[in-house]
Amino acid sequence: MYVLVTGGSGYIGSHTCVQLIEAGYKPVILDNLCNSKSSVLARIHSLTGYTPELYAGDIRDRTLLDSIFAAHPIHAVIHFAGLKAVGESVNRPLEYYNNNVFGTLVLLEAMRAAQVKNLIFSSSATVYGDQPQIPYVESFPTGSPSSPYGRSKLMVEQILQDVQLADPQWNMTILRYFNPVGAHPSGLMGEDPQGIPNNLMPFIAQVAVGRRESLAIFGNGYPTPDGTGVRDYIHVVDLADGHVAAMKTLHGKPGVHIFNLGAGVGHSVLQVVAAFSKACGKPLAYHFAPRREGDLPAYWADATKAAEQLGWRVSRSLDEMAADTWHWQSKNPQGYPD
């Protein structure tokens, strides 16, 4: 069964391709390689014996999308492609709305023309905004994200619900991620951000391997046990398995189904630093910096719905997330080859 994976050479997309292949699916990748490298395909082949076909292009290219649907019997689409840095989105809102919202519109139109009406969308816990209760449950109201990135994800969620309401033949699953970290346990695949990392774990990894001098921890006066921000960190392979679970339940379930994918427990920035220091066997340099606008003190997921309806649960601990990230970064100090 062929699955089109937009953004499939990126961090989460590539790990999901591995898990899809192991589950018997045949991913076809569309990626403009703006934050990834095509050399990941060789790593996917090393792990699975299968090399997905890569179309190096943009989801806003309707002609390219039509050619992909014409060339392959695509059964479903997993839609990862999009810009994803919260802070960057504040300074570049037009690019975020163009990529994330307009790009999804072009994809949906191409899917409709090809009569492919099975979609899994990569959303984010940022759609919840600041909630008065923790953990976050899917039934919580949305509508107050604090960044253009979060608003772009929420806009797409609303578009998907409108599309499905107009045409009930669509099967749509929205997966709201919390904080994906970690790497494939083989050390062959991991997160390789272009430029300065926007996320905590890859920045720590680059400090540990000597590419960065010190980690900036944004804020140490939050109302949390150690004063640093608390987040729900989920191992990327657990997250990838969540997509496979969603694929297995997608067909024949018309509607829009929303699931949190998180570990269901929060860890502070300093706890993550301690876990990584343990993994790499040395202390890591860090310093405190002012809070970033829009950052919340603490949140984590209630993933009960995914457990009950998808049969999915996380199985990897924070220590494993840190150890697997270090295994990847120490084997690949400069990331993937160009």
Swiss-Prot record:
Record-level GO BP terms: galactose metabolic process; monosaccharide metabolic process
Question: Which terms in the GO cellular component ontology are assigned?
Answer: cytosol
Keyword NAD among UniProt keywords: yes
- Provide the alphabetized UniProt keywords: Carbohydrate metabolism, Galactose metabolism, Isomerase, NAD
Residues recorded as binding NAD(+), renumbered to this chain, are: 11-12, 31-36, 58-59, 80-84, 99, 124, 149, 153, 178
Pfam families in the record: GDP_Man_Dehyd
Q: Which cofactor does it need?
A: NAD(+)
> What does the record give as EC number?
5.1.3.2
- Enzyme active site: Y149
For the ligand (substrate), the binding residues are S124, Y149, N179, N199, L200, A216, I217, F218, R231, R292, E293, G294, D295, Y299
InterPro entries tied to this protein: NAD(P)-bd_dom, NAD(P)-bd_dom_sf, UDP_G4E
The reaction(s) this protein catalyses: UDP-alpha-D-glucose = UDP-alpha-D-galactose
Keyword Hydrolase appears in the UniProt entry? no
Which molecular-function annotations from GO does this UniProt entry contain? UDP-glucose 4-epimerase activity
Self-association and partners = Homodimer.
Q: Which family does it belong to?
A: Belongs to the NAD(P)-dependent epimerase/dehydratase family.
Q: Which PANTHER family match?
A: UDP-GLUCOSE 4-EPIMERASE (PTHR43725:SF47)
Which NCBIfam families would you find in this protein's record? galE, PRK10675.1
Q: What is this protein's function? A: Involved in the metabolism of galactose. Catalyzes the conversion of UDP-galactose (UDP-Gal) to UDP-glucose (UDP-Glc) through a mechanism involving the transient reduction of NAD.
Q: What is this protein called?
A: UDP-glucose 4-epimerase
Organism this protein belongs to: Yersinia pestis
From which lineage does this chain's organism come? Bacteria, Pseudomonadati, Pseudomonadota, Gammaproteobacteria, Enterobacterales
Q: Which gene encodes it?
A: galE
